[in-house]
Amino acid sequence: MKGVFALILTAALLLGASAAAEKRKVEPLLLPMPLYNQHDYAEPVFTWHERDVTVEESGCGAACVAMVVGYFEPDDAPEPDDVMSLAGELGLYRGDGLGRDALRLLLDEYGVEGRWRKMDAQAIENTLRKGYPIVEYVGAGYFTENGHYVVLRGITEDGKLLVADPNSEEKTTQKTYRFATMIQQGKGDYPFMICEKEDVPVETAQKESAQRSAKRK
């Protein structure tokens, strides 16, 4: 009985610690970037095998690339349809959106280095606090019925993630997410792409991007 009681007590302590951690106050962080909704881009960008290709239908990856580039280069930021057009020119479109390698190559075209990685909560937080946005490839679940891209863009005071979802304004502006939730939503062995631009100081990028966001308001 003592052993059973000890197990119950340990479980209760762990649950209490988990709840306390969930409520802990942390330094909030926001990486200011343009927030694009792919449904605002319904016009055909190019034709693939006699079918019109639009950002609205298959451009979540292009929208995420545009948001990341807009964060680093606020004065020279492409829009999602510009990115999708470039994908077509480079032959990166394969009929059902853009693959992970395509996103990495598109970022490279804009001078941003993307590296797909497996990440735990601490690695995600450390990366964001360095000023590097993270593109995540999510599988079937909360965000999508199949495959989808979102951008991790900040941390709230209560230790949750801010996410830019190009498929949903509500999930972008009105929702926050536990680290464990986003890790669980990731699809594949390496679902997180760290985005860096070495020749642009992070502080400068954040300041200029914030100024541009303020002007848009």
Q: Residue locations for each model-derived region?
A:
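Mid-length scaffold segments of soluble, non-membrane domains
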Residues: 78, 83-119, 129
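Sec-dependent N-terminal signal peptides of Gram-positive bacterial secreted proteins and lipoproteins
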Residues: 2-21
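Noncatalytic regulatory segments and standalone regulatory/sensor domains
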Residues: 24-28, 33-37, 155-217
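Solvent-exposed loop/turn segments at secondary-structure junctions
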Residues: 55, 67, 74-76, 90-93, ...
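Active-site-adjacent structural segments surrounding the nucleophilic cysteine of cysteine proteases
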Residues: 18-92, 140, 207-208, 213-216
